[in-house]
Swiss-Prot record:
Residues 116-138 have a biased composition (Polar residues). GO terms for biological process: attachment of mitotic spindle microtubules to kinetochore; cell division; mitotic sister chromatid biorientation; protein transport along microtubule to mitotic spindle pole body. The gene is ASK1. It comes from Chaetomium thermophilum (strain DSM 1495 / CBS 144.50 / IMI 039719). The keyword Cytoplasm applies. Keywords: Cell cycle, Cell division, Centromere, Chromosome, Chromosome partition, Cytoplasm, Cytoskeleton, Kinetochore, Microtubule, Mitosis, Nucleus. GO terms for cellular component: cytoplasm; DASH complex; kinetochore; microtubule; mitotic spindle; mitotic spindle pole body. InterPro entries: DASH_Ask1 (IPR013964). This is DASH complex subunit ASK1. Residues 86-138, 150-355 are annotated as: Disordered.
Length: 508
């Protein structure tokens, strides 16, 4: 019996396709739910506890950070506000949101009222004196505007203090529909600055602005005239200070009297405001330090042969100040009588730096084209004081040690140096010839030498900077193999205690 062949798959109907799609959607939603539950379980059981634990651990760090933040703010006199408020209260409450929305509505309402004053028909407000301050008509009659200028000028400070009485947006009886509550204190400035001005006052404001521009131009031209007058004057800035200050004060008084004449109204108030905002240029000359580029000479001294000296900077010309020559007779006449007495002490010589202060006499004694000059410099350096604590560059005010070459001339000092070197060299050679290995063996073992640790101060070396630097250079030359260049210097390294040149002397 033969098996039937596979039949062709029949096409699904629309109902079956819809059911299949619904099953797939249901399975997908179930998978999404299971995944969401799994993620929620992971977040709540693993992540959130770790975050809370991290917050608890970092609380102390945040407290310390706030302390240092306040400390640096107080030390630098700076306030860094904003971050701490966001951290402490990051979520705004609904009440705060509504308050913020109300503030925005108030500012927009004030702006709309200043731009289009015809949309509102407020009832007339009465001030403390019982007079109408402002009366605005409806859309049909915008031209009839009554504005008490003198009252407004006098009651302007009262409006700042009692803003509730004179506010256009005030609606105590509920006459205005869609009115907003009072604006915060920061809205007062906006309303007062953008208060609707009547049509008649626009020309006055324009005139005041033109007057302020004219005053500014007058100040500028007067400044330019004053500076040119200063440069025209041959004596520079030294003459006419008091007269110019008096003229400036008189001009200020005349301007104040001219601006304050007439009735007291908005023109005078606005003119005073515009004048106060302008830079006070006419007071700048009072604080100018009049220092000439060339002292004790005017500008005319720059080019005496030319006719005009205006605009010439004295710095661009080379001026060589010449001091008047004083004759010897004049100095003798000006000298007081007590200086001529023989008992007066001579004037101390000015301090002079020793040219050979840092020259080593041992290095300068060998070779070179100017050997004699070097020897003289070395003799000067040796003649310097060797007291510790006394600087080499300062003059010898009071010498504590005996100056060996004080009364000897330069040639005798040089001769003494050469003789001392030759004697030291001969003595060293004789000592080295006497010491031999045979004599050391004959004497046997040398007895132990007792070292005295309490060294008296007289045995300590007195090494100023010059001698110490010379010893360091000699040691470096010995290490580098330049022992031939150093003759007459000590063969032993320097130590704290003075060394005996006589090696055979066993005394400490």
């Amino acid at each position: 019996m033969s098996r039937p062949g596979p039949s062709a798959p029949r096409q699904l109907t629309l109902t079956e396709e819809l059911e299949k799609l619904e099953q797939q959607i249901t399975l997908t939603l179930q998978e999404i739910d299971s995944n969401f539950a799994k993620a929620h379980r992971i977040v709540t059981t693993s992540i959130l506890p770790l975050v809370e634990q991290y917050g608890e651990h970092s609380r102390a760090v945040w407290e310390a950070t706030k302390f240092w933040k306040q400390f640096f703010e107080a030390s630098a006199n700076v306030s860094l506000s904003g971050y701490e408020e966001l951290v402490d209260g990051g979520e705004t409450s609904p009440a705060e949101e509504t308050a913020h929305d109300q503030e925005e509505e108030q500012t927009t309402a004030i702006h709309d009222h200043t731009q289009e004053p015809s949309q509102y028909t407020p009832r007339p407000q009465t001030s403390a004196g019982g007079h109408d301050t402002t009366t605005l008509s409806s859309v049909d009659d915008q031209s009839s505007v009554l504005y008490d200028r003198s009252r407004a000028a006098q009651q302007q400070p009262a409006q700042l203090q009692h803003h509730d009485d004179s506010s256009v947006l005030t609606d105590r009886d509920g006459d205005l529909a869609g009115s907003t509550p009072h604006a915060p204190p920061r809205g007062i400035k906006i309303e007062q600055q953008q208060q609707p001005q009547p049509a008649g006052d626009e020309m006055d404001i324009d005139m005041d602005e033109e007057d302020s521009e004219l005053i500014f131009q007058q100040h500028t031209t007067r400044l330019l005239g004053e500076t040119s007058r200063y440069y025209d004057d041959d004596h520079g800035f030294e003459q006419g200070e008091e007269e110019e200050d008096e003229e400036e004060e008189e001009e200020e008084e005349e301007e104040e009297e001219g601006g304050g004449g007439g009735e007291v109204g908005d023109d005078s108030v606005l003119g005073a405001r515009s004048r106060s905002k302008n830079p006070v240029l006419h007071r700048m000359q009072n604080k100018t330090y009049r220092i000439m580029a060339t002292p004790h000479k005017g500008i005319s001294a720059v080019k005496p042969n030319t006719t005009s000296n205006r605009g010439v900077s004295p710095v661009r010309w080379k001026i060589q100040p010449t001091t008047p020559k004083i004759k010897q007779e004049d100095t003798e006449k000006k000298r007081p009588l007590w200086e001529d007495s023989p008992s007066s002490s001579p004037e101390p010589a000015p301090p002079q730096l020793r040219s050979a202060a840092f020259m080593s006499p041992m290095r300068l004694a060998y070779g070179g084209p100017k050997t004699s000059e070097k020897l003289q410099a070395a003799a000067k350096a040796i003649a310097a004081p060797r007291t510790p604590g006394v600087s080499v560059q300062t003059p010898a005010v009071g010498r504590k040690t005996k100056d060996v070459f004080g009364g000897v001339g330069m040639q005798s000092a040089t001769k003494a140096i050469v003789d001392a070197k030759a004697a030291a060299k001969e003595k060293r050679k004789s000592i080295l010839e006497e010491i031999t290995w045979e004599s050391d063996e004959d004497l046997g073992v040398s007895p132990p030498k007792t070292i005295q640790f309490a060294v008296p101060a007289s045995r300590l070396m007195q090494t100023p900077a010059r001698e110490a630097s010379r010893r360091i250079v000699d040691d470096l030359l010995l290490t580098a193999g330049g022992g031939d260049l150093i003759e007459g210097s000590s063969e032993y390294s320097p130590s704290v205690v003075k060394m005996n040149q006589d090696i055979m002397d066993e005394s400490f």
